[in-house]
Each structure stands twice: as structure tokens, then as C-alpha cells.
Amino acid sequence: MSNSDKNNNNNTNNNNNNNNNNNGNFGIWEEPDDDSTNENEELFNNLITKTTKFIDDDEEEEEEESSWDTLYAKHVETSNTTQPFNNSNSNNNNFQTQPTNISTLNPNNNNSNNSSSGSSSSRGVRTPRGTRSNSPPQPSKNETVQKESSGDISEGFTLIDSPNDNNDNKNNNKNNNNDSNIVDDDEDEEEFPTLSKKNQKRKPKKSTSSPSSTSSPIVSPQTQTSKLESSMDVSPSSGKQSWSELLKNVADEDINNNNNNNNNNNSNQYHQEEENYYDSDDYDSSPFAIINNSSTTTNNNNNNNNNTTTTTTTTTTTNSSSLPIVNSQSFEEGEEITSDIKIGIKPKTVTVPFQSTLSLRARTKQIKKVQQQQQQSSKSKPNNNNNKFVDNNPYAVLEEEERALQSAIKASLLLNSPVDLDSKQQNVSQQKQQQEQQPTTTTNSVSSSKSKSVATTDKNRTTSTAVAPTTSSNKKANKSNKTSTANTTATTTTTASSKKNKSNSNKSSNVSNTTTTTSTTENSASEGSFIKNAVIFIFILLLMVVGFKYTQTLNQ
């Protein structure tokens, strides 16, 4: 501060001597004095307003005096004449001086003997070295804070020479005009409108996702781009970055991420959106845009590039043929669907409409059913070329053998059914005639399946295996039924997978069929005789019991 300022603040010459001594001992740092509270408050006002400046206002703009945005913008004016300083100093002052300004900048704190307030307010304050700039005399108490807060910061810093020392008087005149307006308009609210309005302006800062400016009030949104561009050029030599500059970088990053091709169009669109949704006259409303800018810019990209993209909300798909479906079908371009795209299901075409909610077992069952249907459809189509048929369905030969075996088993079961012997013999004769007339049909496959066992064993041996259960059937009726059916199935199923020795197949099959049929007829005849014998035996036992009881009664 200058000597005239100290005299107006009722400081003594002892204070000057102390400052000189402290400068010699401690460099540019000043030790606190009990009588220097007013000076320290003024220095703090100067530092706070210069380090916590959030707006870079254009001088050519004319705003309404009714809004507190315009008052704050006028108060923080004179940014072109400020002294640039280092980035580390600015950051330190932002965090050191800002918490203490509310306690120290109290107009009722006039006690110069209060050592605690002086010591707490004067820590870290820089005193000038060398020449000192002249300043006008101090006005009243209410105007001192405002005037000194908007003064030249070169009074507190002398490390770097100010390039704009010639414009000090002009800036001081502007500050006087601006201060008078602020005091007249804000007398009804609080004595320090800058602090209260700054705190109010910081309240709407709710989220960092929106790229709009958080703490700089936008009075005329039409000139927002010019404000943001002008904020880049205010203090080029200083390492400090203003809030508007940082917020512009955030907005540019969001726009670049969302728009790879049209950066300029989307930046203009972002400002137009904010113009539509922000009202400068509404003091309580936040300057954030209501619409999420990321979603709107993606949709506009789609309109500009004429590309349809698949998102969670859209219903059109492009090039999703790689997604697997049960029937190996794919989507067509521009086709509307109602199910989840990732699963790749069209409920109208798939048999199970709720396949996305089915379990793994249900899905595997459905896949097996579809495969079986495809195999049956391929079977129903006659193919003259056996090679192609085998290539399409490698299990076709085995399936034919299984069908032939099933037909043979059914025939054997019919023979074992309780029918008269004449009808059985007629069935046997019919089967023999069919085998003689159609040796190349199903019986041929049966014979081919039985050729292996017949080639390895003698004919007598096969007949003995077929006739063997007749000896045991005379003892028990139930076992004879089971053994006869088991033997007939055994002679057919044990040789199901053989494909060799086709030359002896017809003869061996005829022999084996005849032996099995004769064995079954003998079994059925023995069953009828056994039942008759059993009935006679039971009748004789009853007669014996009755006679025995009758003799006992006679003896008594």
C-alpha cells in the first residue's frame, strides 16, 4: 500500500519502520501488527477479488441494472489492468485467503487492539518493495472494501513489473463508478454483495456432467461464445486458468467425444440448446441445460450421417446376421423386432416365443426338437444317390436297421400273443411268403444284420439256442413267457451293427426265422398243457383235503 493510504487509515510512522525492518529480515513477508488490521483487510479484499474472479466481461456489453449478474459483472471489471502472477501463487491464494475473507471482512470489526484478528488476517500478506503507486484518498467505510477489492493487484506484488501502469487512473475512475452502483443497489440486502452473490452463484453447481458453465452467470446467451473466447485472452502471461476456460475445455471434450465428424455444428447446437433452457432473469434457476447434451448430439449425428444405429431405445437393426438363432436365421436390414437384440430372437418365427426366459435345459430340448424335425424332413425326401444321403445324414443306415429290427420284434410279439395255433401258423406262412417274395426289403436288412452271427456259428447251434428255453418252459409258465421273448429279441439285437457276409444272409435269415417260430409254437403248446395239469393237480388236492377232514369227523 502507499504512504497516503496508510495515513488515511490512521497508521503511525512506527508502522512504516516496522515494515522496513521486517522486509530486511524476512524478505517480502510482513509480520502482523496489532494496528494493521484495516490495511490487512484491504489487502485481503484485493487478493480475494483478483484470485476468485470467475467472469471475464466485455466492456461493450450493456446489461440491465436490476439483475445481480450485471452488478457482479461490473464489479469484477478491470481485468485487463491486473498484474499477472505465477500459477502457484494464484492457487495458494485461492485456498488460503478465501476461507478467511468472511471472518476478516466484517465492517463492524473496528477494534484495532484485537491481536487475534490482526494475526489471523495478516498471515501470508505480501508487502511492496521499491516504488509504490499513488492512489486516491479513502472514501467512507462501506466504499473502502469495494474500492480496494477492485484496485490494482500490483500494489501487493512487486516481483513482476506491471505492463499497464499508465492506465491506473482510468481504472480507478471506473472502479469508483462501479462501486457506487453496487452500494446503492445492494444496501437492502447485505453489506458485502460480492461475497453473498458469489456464494449464491456457487449453489447451482450440482453435477459435473453437464458441460455448461457452473459459476459464471450468462446474462446474454447470444454472446456466450464470444465470452468464452475472450476469456482465453485476458491474461495470456499468467499461468492461471479461469473457470470459463476450464469449462470450455470440458464442453469441447464432450462435443469431440460425441461428434467425430461435425465439431462446429455440434458446438453451435450446444449453445443454442443452452439459450433455449436458461433464463438470465430467473435468479434461482441454474444455468444447466435441461436436456442431456450427449443423447441429443448422438441423435443429430445419426441424422447428419444418415446412419441407423442400434441402441437400447431404437428398434432397427443393421448387419446383425452374425447373431446365432436356433433355426440359423438372420435379421434383415430395417426389420422391426420386439425382443432383445443381443440374444437374436424373432418371437414371430421361433416356435417358443419366450426363449430368452427359458432355462438351459429347455433351450437344449428345443434345439434337439428342431434338429429332429430337420432330420425327419430330410428322411421324407427320397434320394436316389446313397452317397448324398449318407453325407446329409450319416446315421441313415443305422436308422434303417433299427426300423427293420423293430418290425421283426413286433412280428415276434404278435406270434407270442394268446391266439389259436392255426392263426399262428397262418401268420408264419404269410411271413415266409413275404420273405420269399420280397427278399430285398426289410427282411433283407434283418438278414444283413444277422449275417455275422450265422457266419461265426453253425446252424445247429443257432437252432439249439432258440429251442433251448422249451426245456425250462415245462417247469414254470411265467419264466417260459419271459425267456421266449427274450430269446427272440436277443437273436435280433445282438447282431444289429454287422454289415459283412452278405452272400450267406438270405439262407441264414430263413433258417433263423423258422427256428424261432417253431420254438414259440412249442412254448405255447407246453403252456396250455401245463395249465391243464395244474388245474387237475389242484382239484386232486382239494379232494384229498376234503376227504381227510371227512375221515376226522367220522373218527370223532
UniProtKB/Swiss-Prot annotation:
Biased composition range(s): Low complexity: 7-25, 80-133, 164-181, 207-226, 292-322, 369-388, 425-525
Transmembrane domains' residue ranges: 528-548
The UniProt record lists the keyword ATP-binding: no
Region of interest (Disordered), ranges: 1-40, 80-243, 278-324, 363-391, 422-525
Biased composition (Polar residues): 227-243
Keyword DNA-binding on entry: no
Subcellular location: Membrane
Membrane-topology descriptor: Single-pass membrane protein
GO cellular component, one term: membrane
Keywords: Membrane, Transmembrane, Transmembrane helix
Signal peptide: none
Designated name of the protein: Uncharacterized protein DDB_G0289357
Organism: Dictyostelium discoideum
